[in-house]
Amino acid sequence: MSLVMISENVKLAREYALLGNYDSAMVYYQGVLDQMNKYLYSLRDTYLQQKWQQVWQEISVEAKHVKDIMKMLESFKIDSTPPKASQQELPAHDAEVWSLPVPAERRPSPGPRKRQSAQYSDCRGHNNRISAAVRGPHRPSSRNPNDKGKAVRGREKKDQQNKGKEEKSKSTSEISESEPKKFDSTGYDKDLVEALERDIISQNPNIRWDDIADLVEAKKLLKEAVVLPMWMPEFFKGIRRPWKGVLMVGPPGTGKTLLAKAVATECKTTFFNVSSSTLTSKYRGESEKLVRLLFEMARFYAPTTIFIDEIDSICSRRGTSEEHEASRRVKAELLVQMDGVGGATENDDPSKMVMVLAATNFPWDIDEALRRRLEKRIYIPLPSAKGREELLRINLRELELADDVDLANIAEKMEGYSGADITNVCRDASLMAMRRRIEGLTPEEIRNLSRDEMHMPTTMEDFEIALKKVSKSVSAADIEKYEKWIVEFGSC
């Protein structure tokens, strides 16, 4: 439960009460009291519980005052209604006093009539004279001055209505312009479209290029493949068209997925995060439809980057005895969509491109045709000594370090460690001071520790202990295998 939300709701309730909008104020007061009840149940500290109970009592008193005001206003409305006059209260009829005239009904004026006879007109004039004598002398109408005011008010009202209509139409047009474009799912299953739309990363992963240590060549290539074609669309045409596919190869934990997150953050393109579960279905023929739908949606939302992590699980080598017919059809559809006759057509505008960014730890299992379509195949190696030191600085930038910590010395000791291994070492070392502080304490004593007591600087000894506990996860034989493959099939 967010304390900021509770305070904001209390503020709104009080503002509505001050403005006289008591109905809205009561809604907010009721919501605040419910939120505070939930928060009270989650508290373990008795002192804090007492404080919050006092606050709850004060808020409930305020809500009661607002409720009393609402009741009082309601009683005013009931008392102010005039009582209907009964027949007995009417004054007695006096025979010598004329009764009030019955209000005449206004009827629409009839159309042109035929000329009436003289006899009828004489009778009508005679009757008019009698009625005029009965009514008395003619008096000037008292409604004339107000007619002008009514006309002015009518014009003002009409102007306000026209103005309101213009503002409404303007706001609706602005809303329609600000609304994101929606893919037309005609001809496709609605559930399939929604499943793929969920894989569009609309939230910002918040990973910048500076958050990735080393890997200068990989970052340069991704910028050239994704960012530059949008900045210089006139240049990237013909033979200089942007790369359609980039394959990142390397041992686990070297930053391949992190590079994809940086592309999603920095490149401002529509980013599809696709896995094998996204493109597989138990129904026959539906997986191929998913692949085709994915690329059609990517072209609609272009410029687009489709990131396929662990692509070897989707598009492994064809023709093996263990291959199933369904997976073979999915691979064929993926290859056609990437570079087929009816698939990835070359658009004249390079800013509307669709790029496939793939990552794998088993490049030797990928199909040859897919390897050809992934035009750039780059090796993401283990971090160098400079990269390891930079990684240590990035991971430890929020921690307080002791004066005896030498990051260059620690980086030398971590030769052969991947980026994920270095992060694990930093995490383990950062917890050492806390482990020493709570050793031998009861749970109640641990709960009562202050924040300053827990935030102690990490020492060089902590890193040495962490290095003994965390070993490297990549063997030298694996590194040799990756380097041999990249020498044979690499395209940096």
UniProtKB/Swiss-Prot annotation:
Entry's localization field: Cytoplasm; Cytoplasm, Cytoskeleton, Microtubule organizing center, Centrosome; Cytoplasm, Cytoskeleton, Spindle pole; Cytoplasm, Cytoskeleton, Spindle
GO BP, one annotated term: microtubule severing
EC number: 5.6.1.1
Record flagged with keyword Iron: no
Biased composition (Basic and acidic residues): 145-171
Domain of life of the organism encoding this protein: Eukaryota
A GO CC annotation given for this chain: centrosome
Primary location class: cytoplasm
Top-level EC class as recorded in UniProt: isomerase
Key words, A-Z: ATP-binding, Cell cycle, Cell division, Cytoplasm, Cytoskeleton, Isomerase, Microtubule, Mitosis, Nucleotide-binding
Pfam family name, one: KATNA1_MIT
PROSITE patterns: AAA (PS00674)
MF GO annotations: ATP binding; ATP hydrolysis activity; microtubule binding; microtubule severing ATPase activity
Activity regulation (record text): ATPase activity is stimulated by microtubules, which promote homooligomerization. ATP-dependent microtubule severing is stimulated by interaction with KATNB1.
Positions of ATP binding: G250, P251, P252, G253, T254, G255, K256, T257
Reaction(s) the record says it catalyses: n ATP + n H2O + a microtubule = n ADP + n phosphate + (n+1) alpha/beta tubulin heterodimers
Region span, Disordered: 80-186
The keyword Nucleotide-binding is annotated on this UniProt entry: yes
Subunit structure: Can homooligomerize into hexameric rings, which may be promoted by interaction with microtubules. Interacts with KATNB1, which may serve as a targeting subunit.
HAMAP family reported for this sequence: Katanin_p60_A1
Function: Catalytic subunit of a complex which severs microtubules in an ATP-dependent manner. Microtubule severing may promote rapid reorganization of cellular microtubule arrays and the release of microtubules from the centrosome following nucleation.
Family: Belongs to the AAA ATPase family. Katanin p60 subunit A1 subfamily.
Protein name per its UniProtKB record: Katanin p60 ATPase-containing subunit A1
Species this chain originates from: Gallus gallus
